[in-house]
């Protein structure tokens, strides 16, 4: 685990916790956990066991407050989704199929998983080849037009991400890597396949300078300058949303403070840009 945003007091508190405990793991608020072992394999086994214990803890919490027999984390997602949908303010948005895309020169390649990608001219927005244009092609086009630094877009509809997208709220990070990679706060925007041009601009605006934006009832759009980084943003977004789903089971959970989240994001971008420039 790499912790990018640290302070001397934070480091000393972790060292102190390690010294005071005979445990092989120390949980750090907003920073995951440090897992130790006599070898890489031993430390990895500790990390796996800790993940299992934490997931079981959340599942048991869901059983207690729902009165239902929940056996897997997917049951927690189902319960949280039902609670969100039953709220007075919930208004369902039109759901649509996710697409991934890539910018290659002056062209946009966009398509659903397993289908032949459509090829679109980035300047005009007109199709110049490839397969059928998907419903969300204008959404991808709008982001590329607004963000010169973006070359890859991934649309995840992983169950935890979809659950959090149904809230329709701005999501504040509970984990440091979400603040670092995705943004200090993740907004939600509505995309309507029947009003693509207007709603695509709203999504691009909500994304801003971040690397992720929630799409109401449709998961999240994750962006980056290359394919590897886009996949990393997607993975962190999915993990961050899983954490947020678990947090829905508790009355009071405190996200990372606004100033700290912006600082984490800024330091990550500065360090990453220096690394990329080498």
How does the language model describe each region?
Residues 1-278:
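Glycine-rich flexible loops
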């Amino acid at each position: 685990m790499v912790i990018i945003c640290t302070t001397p007091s934070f480091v000393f508190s972790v060292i102190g916790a390690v010294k005071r405990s005979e445990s092989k793991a120390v949980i750090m608020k907003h920073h995951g956990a440090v897992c130790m072992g006599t070898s890489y394999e031993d430390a990895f086994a500790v990390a796996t066991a800790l993940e299992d214990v934490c997931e079981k803890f959340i599942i048991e919490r869901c059983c207690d407050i729902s009165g239902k027999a929940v056996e897997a984390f997917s049951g927690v997602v189902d319960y949280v989704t039902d609670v969100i949908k039953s709220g007075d303010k919930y208004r369902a948005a039109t759901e649509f199929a996710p697409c991934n895309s890539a910018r290659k020169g002056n062209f946009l390649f966009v398509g659903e998983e397993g289908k032949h990608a459509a090829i679109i001219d980035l300047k005009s927005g007109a199709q110049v080849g490839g397969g059928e244009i998907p419903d969300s092609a204008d959404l991808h086009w709008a982001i590329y037009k607004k963000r010169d630094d973006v070359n890859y877009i991934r649309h995840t509809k992983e169950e935890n991400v979809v659950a959090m997208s149904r809230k329709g709220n701005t999501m504040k990070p509970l984990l440091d890597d979400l603040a670092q990679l995705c943004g200090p706060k993740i907004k939600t925007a509505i995309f309507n396949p029947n009003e693509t041009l207007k709603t695509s601009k709203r999504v691009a605006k909500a994304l801003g300078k971040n690397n992720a934006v929630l799409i109401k009832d449709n998961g999240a759009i994750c962006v980056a300058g290359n394919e590897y980084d886009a996949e990393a943003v997607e993975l962190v977004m999915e993990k961050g949303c899983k954490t947020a789903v678990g947090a829905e089971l508790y009355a009071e959970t405190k996200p990372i403070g606004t100033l700290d989240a912006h600082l984490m994001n800024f330091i990550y971008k500065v360090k990453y840009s220096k690394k990329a420039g080498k």
